[in-house]
Regions:
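Extracytoplasmic small-molecule ligand-binding "clamshell" domains
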Residues: 24-96, 238
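Acidic, polar ligand-binding/catalytic clefts
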Residues: 65, 70-133, 202, 207
Length: 249
């Protein structure tokens, strides 16, 4: 009886250990709650049907389909996304988010799925030709983005600039158009979209080091992280990823 009790206890603790181990690996939720900021075309935006669309959304919906999970999208300010994830209100952030050491302290990231850098938007008659020409100038940015960090002097070579922060990238562009700022610093793809949609503006390209977009995952949720990485790789191999690139970017 004593031996049986020891064996039973041993099995019980082994079972608990496996459950704890599984729990520590995280989980793949039946409904994946995806946070985004739909002000970043072509990666995320509100389309003509008033739906949140874009490359990131299409990729996450395809991943959800392959994992047999529903995908629920929550639109919010970019600067609020990581806080919402830390509060366990989001499973994934899909928002053209650049991987940085600071962000890694709060969230985990999937493998990178896109490489970009920062462009400068100026008026056509502007004398600005390179990033160092913005020293001491007024720069409009979307708050919390890499453009904000560059304008603030955290990256590359902008010094002593006055930084005007906006909740939406388009608002930063409108401020430039009306003469409230000298330039906008923003990621390459949305920069091209904004200039295409607004006469009287021009681009100054490739003005920063490369940056890498990835999906953010709740810290420690290795199961979901591995699952998304696996499906991203599969999508690249079977051509689905390239089809979405051609459709949106």
């Amino acid at each position: 009886v004593a031996l049986a009790g020891v064996l039973a206890a041993s099995m019980m603790f082994t079972g608990c250990s496996k459950k704890e181990e599984a729990k520590s690996e995280g989980e793949i939720p039946k409904t994946i709650v995806v946070g985004t900021n739909a002000e970043f075309p072509p990666f995320e935006y509100v389309n003509d049907d008033k739906e949140i669309d874009g490359f990131d959304m299409a990729v996450m919906k395809e991943i959800g389909k392959r994992l047999d999970c529903k995908v629920k999208i929550k639109n919010m300010e970019f600067k609020s996304l990581i806080g919402a994830m830390e509060s366990k209100n989001l499973d994934v952030i899909a928002a053209g988010m650049t991987v940085t050491d600071e962000r890694k302290e709060a969230v985990d990231f999937t493998d990178s799925y896109y490489t970009s850098n920062q462009y400068i938007i100026v008026k056509e008659d502007s004398k600005v030709k390179k990033i160092s020409d913005l020293d001491g100038k007024t720069i409009a940015v979307q708050e919390g983005t890499t453009g904000d960090l560059v304008a603030s002097g955290d990256y590359d070579s902008v010094k002593d600039a006055k930084v005007k922060r906006f909740k939406k990238g388009v608002d930063a562009v409108m401020d430039l158009k009306k003469g409230g700022s000298d330039a906008v610093i923003i990621d390459a793809n949305p920069a091209q979209e904004f200039v295409k949609a607004n006469e009287g503006l021009r681009l100054i390209k490739d003005q920063s080091s490369k940056e890498y977009y990835a999906f953010a995952i709740q810290k420690g949720n290795k199961k979901l992280q591995k699952a998304i990485n696996k499906e991203l790789e599969a999508m690249k191999k079977d051509g689905t990823f390239d089809k979405l690139i051609k459709k949106y970017i």
